[in-house]
Regions:
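Outer-membrane beta-barrel translocator/pore domains, especially the C-terminal barrels
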Residues: 73-449
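Flexible loop and strand-edge segments within Gram-negative outer membrane beta-barrel domains
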Residues: 1-68, 72
């Protein structure tokens, strides 16, 4: 039996709005939450049982705290066989409103509370042939809502899904190198079921850059299961050279066989099925790391996602330069783009001191998104840094459209207050946090990413 407590609470909902956030999350950097959860887990043979209470405190007074799960019960069972594996999962959650006294909710929204029951039953078979492996995974998803508002009737929903995968692995070795080739073919289909009448409790979009990238999991949460049908071919190459350098190459081709009616219903518009090609290339050595990744829509003739960068690690200097581009960011809306370049520098000086600096610039609006420079110090027991920073925040968030609509003037005022230069001081007592020589650079990682 294991117990986990992850609980934080602030007396002032605006106290942590100045926390720095990753530039790659710029579309959602308005959101800061404190997790408040207690859970207990028990593993007995092939059964896993867990019970939890989970909630969040929003550190933005105009964004809802969301719902509290009190409780959430999970049951999982898995039975392994010689060629077939059976699995079953069940989840029961009782949702209540975690009220934010700054934000007014209409009565209709306030009544959308109740219970959700979700189960998944399926099996997977794996056959090992001479030159390839065949995997077939089939499952049925069942969900049912019991809402406190008796005027709202929610039907139970059963959603079948199947995935067929053919994969192989080839290797080649020589005196100074070792290579792996991994081809893979995938067919996946999830049947469409109308879920528009179901409430949304803990649904959150995965920020992969757009809804139709080379992934199958579109959402966190269980309130919407997108219908999908596609064919995917993937080729991976991994090569190690002289035990000091690594080369990774991947190319993916994906053809969607139908559009997703569930996602189109959520966006209230029609996004047609697509045909895409993507690639990912990276090279790493002792002093150099370079990478390139892109995803291109052939039918729309649009670059959905792209990033390239180089990182140079010298004995006393670390230099990073990158360019990132993506369109159709789900956290903003269905049609938009982010295009920015990042530069950062870390220079070690004598006796543990360091100079740190960096800038991120939006190439579309020709404006600086974030910049910083300063000094830091780190030894075996203490680390601190003092630096000046300037950041321009974004207020747009599709998931909280109503909070923008009814508090637009307050949002603009808050943005104007936060979008100013500041002096930051941070310190860490490494003896209390388990620091050691292997974690020497961890203190500076958030600024360098």
């Amino acid at each position: 039996v294991t117990t986990s407590i992850d609980w934080a609470k602030s007396s002032d909902s605006m106290v942590l709005l100045d926390l720095p956030s990753s530039l790659t999350s710029i579309a959602n950097q308005r959101d800061h939450y404190l997790r408040q959860s207690v859970s207990m887990n028990m593993l007995v043979n092939n059964f896993l049982i867990s019970i939890a209470r989970e909630g969040f405190q929003s550190l933005n007074p105009f964004i809802n705290n969301g719902f509290i799960k009190k409780p959430e019960l999970n049951l999982e069972y898995q039975q392994y066989g010689p060629s077939v594996t059976y699995f079953a999962r069940a989840n029961y959650s009782n949702f209540d409103i975690n009220k934010n006294h700054y934000l007014l909710l209409d009565n209709k929204t306030a009544k959308q509370i109740g219970k959700r029951f979700f189960t998944e039953i399926g099996a997977e078979t794996l056959q090992d042939f001479r030159y390839f492996d065949l995997s077939i995974n089939g499952s049925f998803l069942y969900k049912k809502y019991d809402l406190d508002d008796i005027k709202i009737n929610s039907k139970s929903t059963t959603i079948p899904s199947v995935e067929i995968k053919i994969s192989s692995l080839f290797s080649q070795s020589s005196e100074d190198s070792f290579s792996l080739f991994m081809p893979e073919f995938v067919y996946q289909k999830t049947t469409y079921k109308d879920q528009s009448a179901d409430p949304i409790f803990d649904l959150h979009q995965r920020n992969f850059g757009n809804f139709n990238r080379l992934n199958t999991k579109y959402f966190f949460g269980k309130d919407r299961v997108p219908d999908t049908e596609f064919l995917l071919a993937r080729l991976k190459l991994q090569k190690r050279i002289n035990n000091s350098s690594r080369l990774n190459f991947q190319i993916i081709k994906k053809n969607e066989l139908q559009e997703s009616r569930v996602i189109n219903s959520m966006l209230n518009q029609s996004i047609e099925k697509d045909s895409q090609i993507g690639t990912n290339v990276s090279f790493e050595s002792e002093i150099l790391r370079a990478y390139f990744a892109a995803n291109y829509s052939q039918k729309r003739n649009t670059l959905n996602f792209g990033q390239t960068g180089i990182e140079i690690q010298l004995p006393e200097t670390r230099l990073i330069l990158s360019r990132k581009f993506q369109t159709n960011v789900p956290l903003l809306n269905s049609k938009n783009k982010l295009d920015y370049v990042e530069f950062s520098l870390e220079r070690s000086m004598s006796e543990g001191y360091k100079f740190i600096g960096g800038i991120s610039k939006d190439l579309d609006s020709k404006k600086n998104l974030e910049s910083y420079f300063g000094f830091g110090f780190e030894n075996c027991c203490l680390a601190f840094k003092i630096y000046a920073s300037d950041k321009r925040l974004s207020k747009y968030n599709l998931l909280n459209f109503h909070s923008l609509q009814f508090n637009n003037a307050s949002w603009d005022k808050m943005i104007s207050i936060e979008n100013k230069s500041r002096i930051n001081f941070e310190f860490e007592l490494k003896g209390l946090t388990g620091g050691n020589n292997n974690k020497r650079n961890r203190f500076f990682e958030p600024l360098m990413k």
